[in-house]
Amino acid sequence: MMRLSSTLRRFRWAVFATWLLLLVPSIYLALNQSSNLTGGGFEVEGSQSLHVQRQLEEHFPDQGASPLALVAAPRADASYEDMNAAVVHLEKLAAEVPSVKIVPNPQQPAPQPDRPYVITLQLDFNNTGAVDVAKQLRQKVGIHGEEPGESQNGKVKFYVIGQGALGAAATQATKHDIAAAEKWNMPIVLIVLLAVFGSLAAAALPLVLGVCTVVVTMGLVYLLSMFTTMSVFVTSTVSMFGIAVAIDYSLFILMRFREELRAGRDQQDAIDAAMATSGLAVALSGLTVIASVTGIYLINTPVLVSMATGAILAVAVAVLTSTTLTPAVLATFGKAAAKRSSYLHWSRRAEAAQSRFWTRWTGAVMRRPWASAIAAAILLLVLAAPAFNMVLGNSMQRQFDPTHEIRGGVNAAADALGPGALGPIRVLVTFPGEGDASSQAATTTIEAVRQQMTKAPSVVSVQPPVVSDDNDSALLSAVLSVDPEDMAAREAIDWMRAELPGVAGQNATIDVGGPTALIKDFDDRVSATQPLVFVFVALIAFVMLLVSIRSVVLAFKGVLMTVLSVAAAYGSLVVVFQWGWLEQLGFPRISSLDSTIPPLVLAMTFGLSMDYEIFLLTRIRERFLQTNSTRDAVAYGVSTSARTITSAALIMIAVFIGFAFAGMPLVAQLGVACAVAIAVDATVVRLVLVPALMAMFDQWNWWLPRWLDKILPEVDFEKPLPKIEVTDLVIIPDNIAALGPSGSDLRTMVRTAARMKTLAPQTISVADPLAFSGCTRPTTRLSTQRAGRPKAHTPGLHPVTMWRGRLSVAVDALQTEADTEQAPVERRGPVETTNVQLPTGDRLQIPTGAETLRLAGYLIMCRNTTKDFEDFARLVDLMDSHTAALVLASMDRYYCGRDPSNRWVATQLVRRLADPQPSDEHDVRMSGPDAAEDWEKVRQRCLSVAVAMLEEAK
């Protein structure tokens, strides 16, 4: 991965050009991809309903289900003339559309002012183009959004209904839902990213990658839709998962990049290190999501296959953008992405540092692992319990609000022809071999079947049989007294499939189809294959975790915990939609959940949950390989990853909830389930169950049989990253960074550092043992204490505030040196500096603590002002007098004076410090009321240093 990252960095402009070439045509394709999408796709290969549908298309050209119809619905004040004119107008509009013809319907009476009128249409080609035709008709009759068209006087409403119209309306609704969801979730995502990174440039990177992912994926969907059936719901799936996953993946890499910068790596090495760790975890997570979602293909229905394909494409493109574009972007704009804005004060803490809160949290969980694990498991089981009351169903019409024009048109058509006339049950009687459907024996069999059909529940009438054009089969159509989507219609299907084959005997085969049978077969296929999907997805997740973590126990626990997250998501669906607990928030109460949701939620949330599992466990394993301590590894992994996982989860939840509020019921259910699963997984599971169970299993967490270790492919998380040279690098530790400097401190420090670099172009970089002298809670790694000396009690400063003071003294001294022609002392060598890492990500050169003291001493000897003594005393306050004396005793090694004798410079400085006499004649009487006391403190501090210097000279 590091080699790939290095290559992408070097050829970043080629990477940009490649993605630009992909993005430009994808924008055009994405804008037009809805023209090839369908509102159907619920056919089940090998089912009776699909067999009947195909036979109707091939051998019953006049009996095929009409994909479209026009409806004229009169108002109460409409007249015969109004209805006749409306029907003529609709027939004229239909005639203007190519490939459309009007089919007479014997069940439809003449236009009447108190009854809607239905104009049945038929296409000259298969129904694959019905959506495009429906769009043209909707535009011609004046349908706008959810409102129907109407006649010139407004007394007759116009509707377009049928499968094609459902697809056209769903396409329009999906576009509206996506726009509404993005208006809701994009600001929230941006706020979360700004809070995480504290930088607009860093926050913009994941958003740009998310948009790029969605656009390119939409273009690929368009290309696929030219060759295979793609559902209109694929656009919502791509938008939802493309944005969420791309932002999450780039977030993982970018946060690791900033962590590596804080650890002392330069920009290029930090990119490579981030890609070798988080980049590899992203690739494995993406593969896991893709492999999990492929389980949907086992159901093998076009609508689910197309939604799964959209999700797979979105995740694949997200992985590609994150692992190829991110290194290139960081190589070009890494400095801007690493900086934190001084105005975003809430985001000043380093993102990859160990959190004290999460360290304490993990410690508390691991001290009581059994109690923590049992409490978390009980909570998850309580959340999952409502899932036992789940009721599944399917309804395309239910995807629209009751006030939508589609629902209004269907209701009007039901008033005109009866509710069952819109979706009659089709019974196909086939005579195998060289059968003759027109023979006397066949006619007798067909009539017996017809008579038996009249006895089925909810059947109103059975139309006379129609013989196929090849004379091998006959078609019987039964009209029901209920809507085709009513449960009573399904009972009629079951009754016919159970009773009619016995009547036909051995000489004929019976297939029952129609719209109701089509949806019923779909639901039955989903229910029958869902256990297989679960086993497949769980096995895939187990294998991917096993390869990534190389632990049988951790892989098994990961799968088990994800199952609990999915179960909690199922329970939330029942609570929100079936029980209507959140009806006040706009989630409608429904009698049954969409049957497509359980397998989609299972596969997608299983894959997405693996993101956090792999990200957390690889971090824990990385630490375990260094320390060989499970508890330390868990504490480190959770404390360093919790903030990243929480931030990523918040982003995903925001995206999913946005679609839940703005989407059609199917999309809303998917959004709610995924949001709950991610929320539970990122909190209860990853931050409670994971540390608790790992503490319980201890060394068993890493158990892997030798034979399995030999056959598993190597995923080299163990490869050590390049060592960091930090001999002269000073990084603000976390317990100090929390204090936070003001924005003015940061800006002043950066400007002053630039000024110092101009005044002292020749510097030497050295380590700074006084880096944190005077700061609250200095780190033992970078601070030193003289043996036998008590620790000084100094006021707590933020390092940036202290370093800004250093720079101010240095610039003052260097400017004075440049302006003075005959100074009493002259500098012998370059200024000693050290490198500091700011909370913004900037690296600056500042004078060391010792060099700052010497520069302050130089100002006292050359300028000798009150301010010089006050600055000197302030510097000494941040350490102790003895440390200052040790530094200043060696002044003659850095400065030479008029008298070349030994220690002349130090001696002159002692004289000035022992009796401060400022050249500006400091007069305490002209100052404030506390001036005398303050000046006396300055004199005493200077005197203490002078005395200490004399003692050191002895």
Curated annotation (Swiss-Prot):
Gene3D superfamilies: Multidrug efflux transporter AcrB transmembrane domain (1.20.1640.10). Its main location: membrane. This is Mycolic acid-containing lipids exporter MmpL11. One of its GO terms (biological process) is cell wall organization. GO terms for cellular component: plasma membrane. Disruption phenotype: Mutant has altered cell wall lipid composition, reduced membrane permeability and altered biofilm formation. It accumulates the mycolic acid-containing precursor mycolyl phospholipid (MycPL) and fails to export MMDAG and mycolate ester wax to the bacterial surface. Does not affect trehalose monomycolate (TMM) transport. It comes from Mycolicibacterium smegmatis (strain ATCC 700084 / mc(2)155). It is found in: Cell inner membrane. The chain crosses the membrane at residues 11-31, 188-208, 214-234, 235-255, 279-299, 312-334, 373-393, 529-549, 559-579, 597-617, 648-668, 670-690. Keywords: Cell inner membrane, Cell membrane, Cell wall biogenesis/degradation, Lipid transport, Membrane, Transmembrane, Transmembrane helix, Transport. The keyword Cell inner membrane applies. Contributes to cell wall biosynthesis and biofilm formation. Transports the mycolic acid-containing lipids monomeromycolyl diacylglycerol (MMDAG) and mycolate ester wax (WE) to the bacterial surface. It is a multi-pass membrane protein.
